Amino acid sequence: MRIPLFILTFLFTFFSLATTPVSADSGVLYTDAVTYCAEAKAVIVDEFDITYHRSNGSVTFSFSLASVEPNLNTSVNLYINAYGIQIINQTLELCDLLQGVICPLPQVNFTGYGTYPIPAEYLSKIPSIAYTVPNIEAYARVQLIRVENNEVAACLQATLANGKTAHQKGVIWASAIFTLVAFLVAIWHTASGTSTSPIQYRWFDILFIFQVAAASGLLHLNYPLVYTNFVQNFHWALGLFYSSSMQSSISKMREKTGGSMDSTAYSEVQYINRKLSPYNVYMDDNGILSSPESLAAFFKESALSKRSLEHFAKRATIPSVLAQNMTTDINTGLPVYTNTLRIPEANAYDTIWFVFLALIGIFIAFHVLLFGMVLLFDRMGRNRSHLGWAARLRRMWWPFCVGNSLRLCLIGFFPIWIFAFWQFHIGDSGLSIFWAVFGILLTLVPLATAFLLSLLRARRISSTSPEINSLYTSFRYFHSIGVLYRQYRQKFHYFWFTPFVLAMIARAGFIAFGPASAWAQVIGNLVVEFIVLVALLACRPHKDKKGDWLGAFLSICRLIAIGLLIAFIPDMNVKPIPRAVIAFVIIVFYGVPVVFLFVGFLWNIGYGYLWCKHSTRVEDGLEVERFSPTSSNSSVPPPMMKNVDAATFVSSDGAAASRGSLSMGGAGASGAGLAGGAAAAGTGLGRRSSLIEPVGDNVYEASASSADGALSPPPVTAYNPYGKEEIGYPYDPQDSRLAYEQAAMGRGGVNGPGSPTDEKQWSRRY
């Protein structure tokens, strides 16, 4: 189906205005970067700049060149292309221009500059969209051709810009600071020990959306220029930071360990001639200027006179520049992405690896300083309730450090796996390959270990709350590995690893190992994201509906953004303007989730402190607070928790039996019952016995509901929520409370004297 051109133009203009700030420099077109497009042989060009000012319809230009051959007569071919549309492609004789001053070319270095008005007939041909769209895909090429044999004597190419770009320092800093603050706030809430704020796991959603956006620019696709500039805003999320000294050290390291790949990074303008380039040519031969005569007339009107060339002066010889069209054969995607950041593709993984090592050093230093502060405030605040957080954090310090270490692995996981796989793909330095293997192990082993330990722990039955997953009752697990699974329901505690971590591995593999097939890269990532979305919709793993909705929404946005990348596959042959429109749509699908996450971040900052202060879910640590002495501000364990000597321990069943014997058989029977209970305790503890027993006044108050409890059901074979078979009475919270009250009041057990089967006797005793 063909989309009407006016609709594409409207969408193109709308999204460009929505993503580009208004500036005082609007209405200016200029050469952004200039380079040789062929080896300089007969003519050396040192400077070539052109700027068009829309406000006064004039052009200012400057150039510096020299001929190295005598009697060099050339013609000039001027070619201008914008969004694949050929605007100018004309060849003119230099002897017919500028009154023959440069025919033949002077064999001296000379410079020229000036400002000249452009006739109105040409101004009307320039579309207004050229001044509003960021990163316009336009370039000019100037070739000097020998008159005698039509060989190219010199070739220059220059990208054109209007001062608007999707690559903004403000976006880079804002996104990086947003992620950093979210991470620090997450650590702050975790350090409190009692916070239930979702920011403790939402921080990774913020980081991951930026990592996915940056990684989408690493594929072997024909990207629009605006999209390549957009994804470069998030190079920090992949750990790609440029440092000249670090790049020099990495290059030397690679050379000494078998590396042979080029260590030079090339600028973006040098990729103009590539097959997969935003400047490639597609369309139509209808130019703004229709004939050589009309173009010659323009030069004649604004020609330089001999008098105006008096300022040309001899200069020192300009050294020859090597041919730079060697970048023509470089693959698009990851190599171009890193080279644009001045990082050679061969140095890409080592750059990320050393940045990650620096992050580990910062992590260690941060925790050392924090521990010193905790010790200081703990000593200062033993009698001050507002400093109770220090005492809590000191007791949970090692689980806290383990949890933050797992977070650090998540930060580096996706970029390290992408570029480690890429290092395997290109080979080169043996030491770089070793670092790649080490990086994979350093990020995978801790997360895989945490995953296996959580699976084993989840199969254990808690003695205090057998109906609840042990991961959500264990203090050590909840405050360490819990930073990964606490956002999920007990049944889906593993969801952080399967499918999310495994999905990151699959994405990295398709990106790094698929540069030979753009279809494999895009479809592979699309299938992975689709599987994640289906898992989210089918399982609804989050502990609340808000989490399920947000998780599915983020996945849908990623799925649409990845799916739209199909338009950039070279085989699709999508024309430049539709590709640019699609690029703006993809930018929207990455921008909208960031807005939602930012609003949620503002809400979650005070969550657990200013509002929603109390835990209401097991997944929020409700059971951990009930059975942990660190759940309060006091450094003294509450009275209901008491360590009991196993040698003299009397279980609840034994105590209840003894009290029942006392009530039914008098003092003599009481002694026998007590002895029987002690003997039972000495023989061994029951399956549900615990060395932590409620003592003192911390017992349930008798209630009418418990007094009027129904008869206990017959024993059945049941399975607990974690797959273990149990024979006996199925657990029910109301029945447990009733049994507890019965034991506290001296009742004799389920079927013994004083049981619910003897209602009259129970009524008299109650």
UniProtKB/Swiss-Prot annotation:
Top enzyme class: translocase
EC numbers on record = 7.-.-.-
Q: Name one GO cellular component term.
A: endoplasmic reticulum membrane
Q: How does it sit in the membrane?
A: Multi-pass membrane protein
Q: Which residues cross the membrane?
A: 171-191, 206-226, 352-372, 408-428, 433-453, 494-514, 518-538, 549-569, 581-601
Which positions carry the signal peptide feature in this UniProt record? Answer: 1-24
Please give the residue ranges for the topological domain Lumenal.
25-170, 227-351, 429-432, 515-517, 570-580
Sites of glycosylation? 56, 73, 89, 109, 325
Give the keywords, sorted: Endoplasmic reticulum, Glycoprotein, Membrane, Signal, Translocase, Transmembrane, Transmembrane helix, Transport, Virulence
Cytoplasmic side, ranges? 192-205, 373-407, 454-493, 539-548, 602-766
Report the gene knockout effect: Results in cytosolic calcium elevation and increased nuclear content of calcineurin-dependent transcription factor crz1. Affects cell wall integrity and leads to abnormal distribution of chitin. Sensitizes the cells to the combination of osmotic and temperature shock, affects vacuolar fusion, and interruption of autophagy. Finally, results also in a significant loss of virulence in both the invertebrate and mammalian infection models.
Q: Where is this region: Disordered?
A: 704-766
User: What is the annotated localization of this protein?
Assistant: Endoplasmic reticulum membrane
Extent of Basic and acidic residues compositional bias: 757-766
Instruction: Share an example GO biological-process annotation for this protein.
Output: fungal-type cell wall biogenesis
Domain of life, per lineage = Eukaryota
UniProt cross-references to InterPro entries, sorted A to Z: TRP_C, TRP_Flc/Pkd2-like, TRP_N
The UniProt function text for this chain reads: Endoplasmic reticulum membrane flavin carrier protein that plays a crucial role in Ca(2+) signaling/homeostasis via the modulation of the calcineurin-Crz1 stress response pathway which is important for both stress responses and virulence.
The similarity annotation says: Belongs to the transient receptor potential (TRP) ion channel family.
Give the protein's recorded name: TRP-like ion channel protein flc1
Native organism is Cryptococcus neoformans var. grubii serotype A (strain H99 / ATCC 208821 / CBS 10515 / FGSC 9487) (Filobasidiella neoformans var. grubii)
Q: What are the leading ranks of the lineage? A: Eukaryota, Fungi, Dikarya, Basidiomycota, Agaricomycotina
